[in-house]
Amino acid sequence: MATFKEMLKASMKSKDTEEWLDVYFTRPIGLVFTLLWKRLGVHPTVITILGMILGAAAGWMFWHSELEYNIWGVVLMMLSNFCDSTDGQLARLTGKKTLVGRVLDGFSADVTFFCVYFALSMRMMTELIPGTDVTWGPWIWVMAFMAGIMSHSPQCLLSDYYRQIHLFFLKGKEGSELDKSEEQWRIFREQPKKALFFRAFYYNYAKYCATQERRTKNFQLMMAEATNRYGAPLNLPAARSEERRVGKECV
């Protein structure tokens, strides 16, 4: 029977793509929940949806200025974060990894942070700008747009892509989720006209992949050159592949 430490390692994508806090705090606690959900036969997608609900509830708590509401908001946000950790760990331990689950996981995070940004903006509209006697008013929405849409969202998109690049060279195609937009567009076009859900799903995922590729032009050139020279990126000589894995010249 595997030890807790062995199961923790198996439940991670790779230790060097995990943040320090996740390795020593979030993931171990998440694994405890994972083992509970596994015993109860809960599917990872259910955990993802639960995390989204908890995140939205946290946003509602942050709408209020009272301390007790804010404390509950922090607690709910932490539980949402544990769910965000647990769904992936459960999927890797049980082999229930799906593209729908991956996309839903990202959507869950988007819903959570939208609710938090929206709630804090609504709350701060009537609060004073620090050091002045002027309220934030509609200007807080400008701040939220710059922080959430122009900064936070692109950062999440690229951090996910860089993580998948690293896993691609570390574990190969099977150990990563580095998808090409060209392939996703092909799958989208193959969906029946009446399959509205799947057409919408693959359309949005193809756009997501295309945005990642558009923002990493040097990496796309490197992948094309590796394919032309060696037949496939994973055929890179070991020394060059290691350089890519640790991040040299790849983006």
Predicted region positions:
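Alpha-helical transmembrane segments of multipass membrane proteins
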Residues: 55-58, 113, 151, 155-156
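C-terminal membrane-associated helical module and adjoining short loops/tails
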Residues: 1-29, 151, 161-248
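Alpha-helical transmembrane segments of multi-pass membrane proteins
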Residues: 77-83, 145-156
